[in-house]
């Protein structure tokens, strides 16, 4: 394994461990970003269920013109996943950045989710 992959894997483990410690039964808002798209889902780890999800691949995003993995798409995904989570009765979550730095697309998604009603 390359040094970069090891560093990223360790960061991801460290983030997940700290999330488990502070979660207190709250679901987590998990973010995955690729070079072409961005994905977010609200996961209840106690039940093992996904409560809400959104990605830049969805038809609603394509119709609005927010495709790809830029900051505008991340904002739209954050807003959409927050609206779906609030609709399912989830108000408080723990933000799981998944080892990614809290900057750029990840930060834009988090800010949009906060503005749309999720608190973390």
Curated annotation (Swiss-Prot):
Keyword set, alphabetical order: Ribonucleoprotein, Ribosomal protein, RNA-binding, rRNA-binding
A single Gene Ontology CC term: cytosolic large ribosomal subunit
Descriptive protein name: Large ribosomal subunit protein uL18
A GO molecular-function descriptor: 5S rRNA binding
Functional description taken from the UniProt entry: This is one of the proteins that bind and probably mediate the attachment of the 5S RNA into the large ribosomal subunit, where it forms part of the central protuberance.
The gene coding this protein: rplR
Domain of life: Bacteria
Residues making up the signal peptide according to the UniProt record: none
Family: Belongs to the universal ribosomal protein uL18 family.
């Amino acid at each position: 394994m390359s040094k970069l992959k090891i560093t990223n894997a360790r960061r991801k483990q460290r983030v997940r461990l700290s999330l488990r410690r502070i979660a207190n039964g709250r679901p987590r808002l998990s973010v995955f970003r690729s070079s072409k798209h961005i994905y977010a889902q609200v996961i209840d780890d106690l039940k093992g269920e996904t409560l809400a999800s959104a990605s830049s691949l969805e038809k609603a995003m394509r119709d609005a013109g927010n495709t790809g993995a830029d900051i505008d798409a991340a904002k739209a995904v954050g807003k959409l996943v927050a609206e779906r989570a609030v609709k399912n009765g989830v108000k408080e979550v723990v933000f799981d950045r998944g080892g990614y730095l809290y900057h750029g697309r990840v930060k834009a998604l988090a800010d949009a989710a906060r503005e749309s009603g999720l608190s973390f």
